[in-house]
A protein has these predicted regions:
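Conserved donor-binding/catalytic core segment of Leloir-type glycosyltransferases
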Residues: 194, 241-258, 264
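Membrane-proximal helix-turn-helix segments that form the acceptor-binding/catalytic region
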Residues: 131, 147-192
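Nucleotide-sugar donor-binding and catalytic loop/hinge architecture
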Residues: 227-247
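Active-site helix-initiating loop/hinge in glycosyltransferases
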Residues: 15, 204, 258-266
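Conserved small/polar residues in nucleotide/adenosyl-binding loops
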Residues: 267-273
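N-terminal strand-loop element at the rim of the active site
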Residues: 7-13, 24-92
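Short N-terminal targeting/anchoring amphipathic segment
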Residues: 86-106, 122-126, 131
């Protein structure tokens, strides 16, 4: 099978990219032909398909006010991405497209590529965050509280709650993006949405995606399993030396939305429990 993998970063930036590259490795090991669509970046892995990658867009670093205004429209819809994606499709001719993180740097404009309509190529999307439901990605509002206000598909809640980086302007732009994607029916062009947990699937279903979601836990490659076994065996030895004291293990990026404060807050209930990060 010819499978086109899409992700806005083509280097190991975070968990989504770890999944993306491991998926490519696994698919190739099973004999599938894999191509890539992504964004140009100095840290990118080499790829034959990089000739089709869109130009780099930095919405986080320091850029001039003029540059921010210039790139605001391409954050919502990129004609460059649509054009280059169409050219890649014409060369690779995929049987299926598997999208990962695409918003803002690539945009869902790629789903308007004429090739997809002509050839009815199925599109799969793996949800690595809550961008389909929440302009801020996290379902946490500007006050730091868990929030599901935008499940009603009225995304201007993000403006009144200043949900994006403490900025009303950025919140407005993110809300405009979400409203545009709703009115443009961009998500109707996705055939299947993979949620890595039942909780996320349930939220997606509440938010209007029922009927096209499945819950599927992220996989582990053989090399990741081997590494995990080595780490586990090391900790078993350490635990034996320390008298096997119970502990809570937090595994993830140290940022508030990942929940690091939750185990910190309850470890005092089970002392002498150790928190390992």
């Amino acid at each position: 099978m010819r499978i086109l993998l899409v992700n806005k970063y083509f280097y190991r930036k975070g968990g989504a990219e770890t999944y993306f590259f491991a998926l490519a490795e696994g698919l190739r090991a099973l004999g599938h032909d894999v191509a890539f669509f992504s964004m140009q970046h100095p840290n990118n892995e080499p790829s034959y398909w990089s000739k089709y990658f869109v130009s780099e867009k930095d919405y986080v670093g320091k850029v001039s006010a003029f540059k921010q205004v210039q790139e605001a429209a391409t954050l919502i819809y990129s004609f460059e991405a649509k054009r280059k994606f169409e050219a890649l499709l014409e060369e690779f001719k995929p049987d299926v497209i598997h999208m990962n993180n695409v918003h803002r740097q690539l945009t869902l404009s790629i789903l308007d590529a004429p090739y997809l309509k002509r050839h009815h190529v199925p599109v799969v999307y793996t949800a690595h965050d809550y961008i389909l439901l929440c302009p801020a990605y996290t379902m946490v509002n500007g006050g730091g509280a868990v929030c599901d206000a935008c499940l009603d598909r009225h995304f201007m809640h993000a403006v009144s709650n200043v949900c994006v980086k403490g900025s009303r302007a950025k919140s407005a732009l993110a809300a405009m993006e979400a409203e545009f994607l709703k009115l443009h029916h961009s998500y109707d062009k996705i055939d299947l949405i993979i949620a890595p947990s039942r909780f996320m699937k349930n939220k997606l279903d509440e938010g209007g995606f029922a009927g096209k979601t499945i819950a599927m836990q992220n996989f582990l490659t053989d090399s990741q399993m081997a590494m995990g076994a080595r780490v586990a065996n090391t900790h078993k030895f350490d635990d034996a030396q320390a008298g096997a004291r119970p502990y809570v293990l937090f595994f993830g990026r140290l940022s508030k939305e990942k929940g690091i404060l939750t185990p910190v807050s309850y470890t005092h209930l089970t002392l002498p429990t150790i928190l390992r990060v």
